[in-house]
Amino acid sequence: MSFISRWIEFYDFARGVQHFRYVTENKALVYLGQPYIYANIKRSGLTESGDLTRNVLDLSVPTDLPLLDLYRGTAPMQDIEMTLRRQRKSDGVVETRWVGLIGSVEWSTNKAIIHGLPPMASLKGLGLKRNWQKSCPLTTYGSGLGECNVDRETMRVNATIISTAGLTATAAAWATKPDGWFDGGWIEWSVSGIVERRPIVSHVGTVLTLLRPAIVPDGTVVATYPGDDHTLATCDTKFNNAVNYGGDPFLTEKNPMGSDPIY
């Protein structure tokens, strides 16, 4: 074995069941039973550090790379996992060299830079302690002890898309609910087994305004989930879930430990 043996690098980009697989060898190869096609990929150096901001991986790729079709116009809402494996040509030894997520794509005239983030970027931080507050701090449809526990499927409205244009989408089914019913919610549909989602900014009649553009073919059935303004009234009348309300609507606005001698 030589210490200067060449390595072949395999890149696997996974979006649910959809995969884009590329190899740096100037020919198509099969690895672990999966086909990899050649792509002219140049990467940054790899750093292993306790500072997570340094454990990144940047890839310089051609602008016609099929993977980048997901980022033309608008980036996908779903995380795209990114795995770099490499194989030593002299003895076939394989190692997983880097695992993470695509953070963003930067475009230029003749190339694109894929910015990869480490796995810790997708983990939920500890965050702040829960405040004592009037509004409910719980995540709508979250499940578990002390959570919202509304079954989102009981709130779903299926709607057949009439048209989409920019940030708006139109469907007759949305008019069956009062204006604002879907504010803060989202729409969800499937394309070739891949689930797409778009947050809803506002709802008026048959029209939703979305946070990001959605290219949804006319006639597609989308699942629509209503949002929540996190007040007790909405929790009770809209979701029938006052028993799990996480705020304290009767919290006094005057501090009993303040300087006012008369409380």
Please tell me what each predicted stretch does.
Residues 1-263:
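Interface-prone segments of viral and bacterial extracellular assemblies
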